[in-house]
Amino acid sequence: MAFHHSTSTVSTLLVAGVTLLSVTAFGQAGRSVSTSADMLVYLGTYTGEKSKGVYVSRLDLASRALTRPELAGETASPSFLAVHPSQNFLYAINEIGNFQGKASGSVSAFRIDRNTGQLTALNQQPSVGPGPAHLVVDKAGRNVLVANYGGGSVAVVPIGPDGTLKPPSAFIQHSGSSVDLQRQKGPHAHSINLDPANRFAYAADLGLDKVLVYRFDADKGSLVANDPPFAQVAAGAGPRHFAIHPNGFAYVINEMNMTVTAFRRDVERGSLTELQTISTLPPGQGVSPGFSTADVQVHPSGRFLYGSNRGHDSIVVFAIDQNSGRLTYVENRPTQGSTPRGFGIDPSGSYLLAANQRSDSVVVLRIDKQTGRLTPTGHTIEVGAPVCVKFVERRNR
């Protein structure tokens, strides 16, 4: 479940300046980290004794090594992050249940120092519903769209020219339920994503077993129900995260029954037509107690799909048929840790970084660009309760 209730109210953001260490990379004794071919890696976490907010590391694309993570911005449970198209601003949900005395989570805005990785807090706005779990910045960089798991709702928060957040411009409350009396008594919007044309928003609602489809207007910051307004998945599946393929396909990972459903996406009308549903576990293996899926992403090449399995503690790899959109199982690769809630694929498509929430580690896996298979690199860093990985191209001063 995404929503971890906090009774604390976030009223201020304390930002810790980041001095990225001029240390040798893990596993690369005596070898300095490159400053010309590296990415800033931002790590969203659940805060507590081991974590205080958003952390930053650097990934050297040549050596595969990560620097020791440093606190970049102190804020409450930034469990999902989104980067502005300019790469100059970062936005984080605060997965809390009370903001400024109301039943709401919040969204925090930061300015990125592209050289040091330091985050400067800009401002916060309410997510309108409690327990936000996911957010995305629209392709024009004018709005943040947020999904509230605890409240079962979605909202739009406009972005000003200076990167600050304006008061929410749209809010839609989902309604209904599904078959699981523990998890699906009401709506639980778990993610929201936009199509490449910035015209349609897709909200996966675990509580309803639906992917709701909205027409999105970036100029107005508005959401309007599409026709048809949703795609249905199997009862009790629990749709969680959603990934869009450039060829007109889309994929939702279903948390509760550990499957991925592939859709054909009508790029003009926004509608979704189911193509296939396939298990995220090895062939013949069933769902065990404590197992659930989490994240799903398309490889930058469009050739492969990756999904994370918690409990099984693996990344599943599928090959994508470029003509039909159907998936073929390739492998499950252990994440060398416990509970891989989130992961990130670097923009070059060379590495997958798995965030193991319960073992407090981020592990670097190499991607074979021909087969999609994953290989451990031996590089791991420690950070408290990591759950989200985002990349920003580093810029030398």
What are these regions (language model features)?
Residues 36, 50, 75-86, 128-139, ...:
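Beta-rich, blade/repeat-based domains predominating
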Residues 47-50, 95-101, 150-153, 208-210, ...:
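Short glycine/acidic-enriched loop and turn motifs that connect beta-strands
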Residues 58-64, 110-117, 156-166, 214-223, ...:
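Short loop/turn segments immediately following beta-strands, especially the blade-tip
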Residues 67-141:
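Blade-loop segments of beta-propeller domains
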Residues 67-73, 120-125, 176-182, 226-232, ...:
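A short beta-strand motif characteristic of beta-propeller blades
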Residues 291-357:
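Loop/turn-rich, solvent-exposed surfaces of beta-rich toroidal or solenoidal domains
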Residues 357-397:
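Blade-level signature of beta-propeller repeat domains, shared across WD40, Kelch, NHL, RCC1
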